[in-house]
Amino acid sequence: MSEPSLNFHIQSHSTQFRIPTELIKKNFKTIQKLVEKQKKQMTDDVAKIKKNPNIPTAMKLAMVRKSIKSFEGFQKKLQASIAKDEELRSRLIARIEHLALISEYCITQDKTKTQVEKPSQPQSQNEDTEEKEHSTKDDNDKYLDLHNPNLITWYRDQTNLLIIDYLIKSNTRTDHNIGLLLLKSLSESNPKYMKLIDYDLFESFNKVYVSIMEDHDLTLVIAWFNENRNFLKKANSNLEFEINYCRFLSLIEKGDVNEAIKFSSINLSPYGNVSNYQDTDRANHEHNLNRLKEIGGLLVYMAINEEKRTRNDKIAFSSNLLINSPRFHEYEKLLSDERWDSLSMCFVENFTKLYGISKNYPIFIYLSAGLASLKTKSCYHNTENTIFRENQEINVTDESIYKKDLTVLTDKKYRGSNQYYKLLNKINNCPVCSPELYKLSRNLPYAQLITSIFNNPFKLPNGNIYPFDKLLNPSEKYLSEKNTLLRMGKIKDPLTREIFLIDTCIRVYPA
């Protein structure tokens, strides 16, 4: 697909409907449980009054008033759940309407003018059917008018939403969330922003994540686990073990060894029994069992370490050997921040699985797709291409050609998007080479954009490619010089002015 189409945008924005849908399902189940609980309670209260006709009237009135008060509380909870359901449905409607706007920015494209006629070849019936189905899909698709100013505004809104999504999720401050501040600011001029992003859920997600990573507090993640316990149990989640593991190590850090041992026997020991796992959850059993084995060694480490600090005289020879062993010091890692990283990763994995969304930020996904379509092997720096060296004539037989400016090419302190363009007195505007996007783009694949625009292209040893006719037929300015070189079996690079033997040139066949 070379042009943005309507179907592409519908497919790429389908994930924004998952969270409201899951929240509606969850809220509906909450309403069901609320109604069933209230129904049972009212039935029991009425039956209790009927079974005891001799109860004094005053007591009966008190029981009725209590039931009425309970029912009023039920009504308030029910109204709040209904309002929440209406809010979630309004978000779905707003997103459908917002996505439907791009259907007004489409153009009718005559594909028959752009398609190249293919020679008729015998095809099987299956191939013919597949081609017709693919052709039908393409014919039903619509392409967007990129010159439409309303479409540009629509894209700008989408970009703002992606930025808000990233800022809300990646916030590390506890006093305020900069993503929410930006959302409120933009909503003053465009109120629909509040309906197009699930800011409240992402804020809750960020609070739990920050409480784990920054505050090392388990209160919020425990509450989230209890709220979604049924789903996590069905999904074979290991979050409960990670929480209990962190609680155990926190008790060890505080010095409550006896309390930690008691907590471990109740909350961690069952994870060592394979019968407590499902058949599809063997991987978690092996992982948890290995970590449980380390707990015993950690207690020994804490005991010997405490003995070493409290006693002034020499400790036992065996204990001294144990302290100096490499394995002994590995237990120090158990009390590092790695456990909080593991817990946060487990929480993120379960959160994204619950709502069917990606672990990566949506803005990174779009940026990666765009950068992958632009990335070439010339991005950052290319040690083979001598265009990045000083523009001077060097004989190819001189070995210094490959050593000159080697420090600039290999030293990390010279890495940067503009280092080599400074050598050329040019400005590098490539987004792939920009310092802001370097880390995101460095692991992306190269774009398959290499096409031959030359007739009979040849690659020189320095990496530059030219049509062979241009190398053999120089301009009038360098005619005499080139003729002299050709008689010697050599050619000159028109750009870098380097001289090479013709035999060292290679015929290339770009895709």
Swiss-Prot record:
Subcellular location: Cytoplasm; Nucleus
UniProt feature, compositional bias: Basic and acidic residues: 131-142
GO cellular component, one term: nucleus
Region span, Disordered: 112-142
Residue intervals of the CTLH domain: 201-259
GO BP field: negative regulation of gluconeogenesis; proteasome-mediated ubiquitin-dependent protein catabolic process
Compositionally skewed regions (Polar residues) per UniProt: 117-126
Main localization (coarse): cytoplasm
UniProt similarity note: Belongs to the FYV10 family.
Protein name (record): Protein FYV10
